[in-house]
A protein has these predicted regions:
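Hydrophobic alpha-helical membrane-insertion signals
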Residues: 7-78, 255, 269-276, 286, ...
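Transmembrane-helix signature of polytopic, membrane-embedded enzymes
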Residues: 117-136, 171-177
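Transmembrane signal-anchor helices characteristic of membrane glycosylation enzymes that use polyprenol
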Residues: 13-49, 234-247, 372-375, 448-457, ...
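Transmembrane-helix motifs of polytopic, lipid-linked glycan transferases
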Residues: 104-121, 160, 347-349
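Membrane-interface coil-to-helix junctions
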Residues: 24-113, 132-155, 269-343, 376-392
Length: 830
């Protein structure tokens, strides 16, 4: 091949793509390059979760694998554990570190999508258009703003994983298998199983489609071999992440994802997450239109009504100036939303064009995957289908926030658009057919926008009924608080509420109409470009350039509604800082006590763990028994349970609203001896007894969990001279000194977890058992002795060995495949 042609056809578009993606990412996150920081909720929470882990690692070089900083203590498998044998993640995975986040998120999302499109046969110039649509889809900016780091990386790697499957089943099987193994290893290593799961469902749709076609074409033998290669790549990808997967799988059985031993609670069921809890964030059926029209349902929960709108005018008339800032313009069914999953009107139009023009083999599995994912996203709004999926789709009941399935649609829409544009690029579509398809795609998408813009106000109620009920209660409260009950008797509360609800509905309708017109304009711009190409007024290079511009014009302004330079702050403001209450508590150098912070939502906030061992925390997979304790006792700040958790301090709102420390004098301490043991026949009886028992003198032990105690007859008789003290503390190591005149049971204010914790008395391993539903207990011999607790992930050496072997196989396979494919390409070009 001529060198100049190589530059023009391969190198130039690659340089253009990378340069454009970098410029777009850097421009969007320009404050990052000025040294400013983006305060991200989940990142801030993560810093609290992992604080004692990071501190110990920095101080000693040892990885504790356990945190004592939140929920009384829990394994760190789903927080921060170092797995040295994950070589793929620690080598190839470091490429993404060359550009810092958040700009790196956008850049590599677009690069990954662009590379996938090249692999499936899309021209690189066409790929730029689809990559922009994928990387700039609004959901990415929402999760970047929230700090969902693992989710974002999983979405970066997902297109590459899908392209590996495509190549394995359709192209060079060995190169495809190598790519699948490498990309799937990175995808799994991103540590967001939910995203990986949804893309595996999409991959299954592709595999089924290829299987059907192979059967029809008599290629089942070839298909079977390709399937075997794909499965082998998947096994190696899993193996290269075996360590985190193994420990996560073992640990998940003990968490709310594995179910509760009690009757189903709000968050757990017997076999997984409770259906109501898992489907709390379900996309409304009508809400799906915000994939096309961003403000269809009032934007986000935090969006208020405009100061010059009808709602403000009505409330001003009632003397409630400024009250609009307390009302949300969002009228969907989700409890809270940070914004819509807007895909771009132009991108949706191109996807519709893809449905009309793409070859059946390429499109039907994509369409099927999109339909299934949208139905799953509806969750409780399509409960029959959701219940079916929960019962029969393996592993599906382990995940919450079902609306997240739309990430597959977010990937599929640009892909469908690229498949359509590729047929135009190759000149495969006759002009008449192209114009008919263009009219159909523009008619469907543009027609929907036009209908919403012109008649949308009469098609929906814009949450008017719910608003009327809410405002009725609000006005009734106002009238009662101001001794104006006569207004209520005259029905003024209802009349005022109805007028306000009408105004709220009108403002929401205006927001929808404005964005419907906007989306229509974007569709017309994209359709106009395709029409000019069909009429041969512009060439294919101009068309792709025009469509790339439309993608930027369409998506960036909407993205900026939710995440802009205004969200950035100085690095210092982005740090977690200790309050006066925190500083006062930190003067207490005793290592054993815990803190309950009531100035935040204590069981949905990990910032307290940045400074203290916290009773609360923030995690989506906390231990199931601890969740039971929260539901039954801690949510009501039960004194007895707080005492057994050695809660020495509360942080409460002070007189001037500032956090204030309160010392509790009844906490039991880091460990204590009990006079007697009560045996409970079931987990339900165990937790019930906590509220009926003096836990300072009596331990509650499950009858199904042998106490391994030689002193079953109770009471044991504790003398005044008995003492036990925590003398050394690290997350994975605790040391106690005790003196005891006769054998007795000691309860330790540490969370029971027998998959890694071992107890030693004077250096010899000793048995222990669970007491008080979540704590540890031991029968200790008389005398003066030392008790040590050590945590180590069980089977660490063997598990890491499997991870290392699979990682090496993937890396060597990738190198071999690269050499093989390069030689094949060279021979072909000769």
């Amino acid at each position: 091949m001529d060198f100049s042609n190589t530059i023009r056809s391969k190198l130039l578009p690659a340089l253009a793509a990378f340069a454009l993606f970098f410029v777009v990412s850097a421009a969007y996150f320009a404050p990052q390059f000025r040294g400013e920081a983006l305060p991200q909720h989940d990142v801030i929470q993560y810093e609290g979760m992992a604080k004692d882990i990071s501190d110990m690692r920095a101080a000693t070089g040892e990885d504790p694998q356990w945190t004592g900083g939140m929920f009384g203590g829990m394994p760190a498998y789903l927080i921060n554990v170092a797995y040295p044998a994950q070589l793929v993640k620690r080598t190839v995975g470091q490429v993404v570190k060359i550009i810092d986040t958040p700009a790196g998120f956008l850049f590599f999302a677009m690069v990954s999508m662009w590379l996938m499109l090249l692999i499936v046969g899309i021209n690189p110039w066409v790929g730029i258009v689809a990559a922009l649509a994928y990387g700039l889809s609004t959901y990415f900016l929402l999760i970047i703003g929230a700090g969902h780091v693992t989710k974002m990386w999983a979405l970066v790697y997902a297109p590459l994983m899908m392209s590996g499957a495509w190549m394995t089943l359709r192209g060079n099987v060995w190169c495809g298998a190598a790519l699948t193994g490498l990309a799937a290893s990175l995808e799994i290593g991103a540590n967001h199983p939910q995203i990986t799961y949804y893309f595996l469902v999409a991959m299954a749709a592709f595999w089924i489609s290829e299987g059907i076609l192979s059967f029809r074409e008599g290629r089942l033998r070839d298909f079977s071999l390709r399937t075997a290669a794909l499965v082998a790549a998947g096994i190696l990808a899993v193996g290269s992440n075996f360590s985190p997967l193994w420990y996560t799988a073992r640990h998940s059985k003990e968490t709310i994802r594995g179910g509760s031993e009690l009757a189903a609670t709000a968050e757990t069921s017997k076999n997984g997450l409770a259906l109501d809890y898992a489907t709390a964030w379900s996309y409304g059926k009508a809400e799906t239109l915000n994939l096309l029209v961003p403000d269809f349902m009032g934007r986000e929960s935090g969006t208020t009504f405009p100061a010059d709108g009808q709602t403000a005018a009505v409330l001003n008339d009632y003397g409630l100036r400024g009250a609009t800032q307390q009302l949300s313009a969002y009228w969907g069914t989700q409890p809270y939303t940070g914004g819509p999953t807007y895909l771009g009107a132009a991108a949706v139009f191109l996807a519709a064009l893809g449905i009309a023009l793409a070859r059946g083999r390429n499109k039907w599995w994509i369409i099927a995957a999109c339909v299934v994912m949208i139905l799953l996203a509806w969750g409780r709004n399509l409960m029959g289908f959701t219940e079916f999926a929960f019962k029969y789709l393996p592993g599906y009941n382990k995940f919450r926030t079902v609306s997240m399935t739309l990430v597959v649609v977010q990937w599929a829409v640009p892909l469908l658009g690229a498949l359509a544009l590729m047929r135009l690029w190759k000149g495969e579509i006759p002009r008449e057919r192209l114009l008919r398809a263009l009219a159909w795609a523009a008619g469907i998408t543009g027609g929907a926008c036009l209908l919403l813009a012109v008649a949308g106000g009469s098609l929906f109620d814009f949450g008017r009924a719910e608003s009327a009920d809410y405002m009725t209660d609000t006005f009734r409260h106002i009238f009662e608080s101001n001794n104006m009950r006569s207004y209520i008797h005259r029905g003024m509360d209802i009349e005022s509420a109805e007028a306000t609800a009408d105004a709220m509905a009108a403002d929401r309708a205006a927001m929808m109409r404005a964005d419907a017109w906007r989306s229509l304009v974007m569709i017309l711009l994209a359709a106009g470009g395709v029409a000019l190409f069909a009429l041969r007024r512009i060439n294919r290079y101009v068309l792709t350039g025009l469509l790339a511009g439309v993608m930027l014009l369409d998506l960036v302004p909407v993205d900026l509604r939710f995440l802009s330079s205004e969200n950035f702050v100085s690095p210092r403001r982005n740090q977690v800082t200790a309050s006066a209450a925190d500083k006062a508590i930190m003067q207490d150098k005793d290592p054993g006590y815990r803190v309950l912070n009531l100035t935040v939502s204590p069981f949905n906030d990990a910032t307290t763990s940045y400074f203290h061992r916290s009773v609360g925390g923030y995690h989506g997979a906390k231990l199931a028994r601890y969740q039971d304790l929260i539901d039954r006792y801690l949510s009501n700040a039960d004194d007895g349970v707080l005492d057994m958790l050695n809660t020495r301090y509360l942080i409460v709102p002070g007189k001037e609203g500032q956090p204030e420390a309160q010392r509790r004098t009844t906490a039991f301490g880091a460990a204590w001896f009990v006079d007697s043991v009560i045996y409970a026949p079931s987990a339900q009886a165990e937790i019930d007894l906590l509220g009926k028992t003096d836990l300072r003198t009596t331990a509650v032990v499950s009858g199904q969990n042998p106490a391994k105690s030689a002193s079953r007859p109770m009471p044991l008789g504790i003398y005044a001279s008995a003492r036990i003290e925590l003398t050394e503390y690290r997350p994975n190591y605790l040391k106690y000194e005790y003196t005891l005149p006769e054998e007795a049971v000691a309860v330790f204010s540490e969370i029971f977890y027998d998959q890694g914790w071992k107890a030693y008395v004077d250096g010899e391993e000793s048995p222990y058992f669970r007491a008080d539903y979540v704590l540890r207990a031991m029968t200790l011999p008389a005398g003066t002795h030392t008790v040590e607790w050590r945590f180590r992930a069980p089977g660490w050496t063997a598990v890491e060995g499997v991870t290392l072997a699979a990682s090496l196989a993937i890396l060597l396979g990738a190198v071999a495949a690269l050499v093989y494919c390069f030689r094949k390409r060279t021979e072909k070009e000769k």
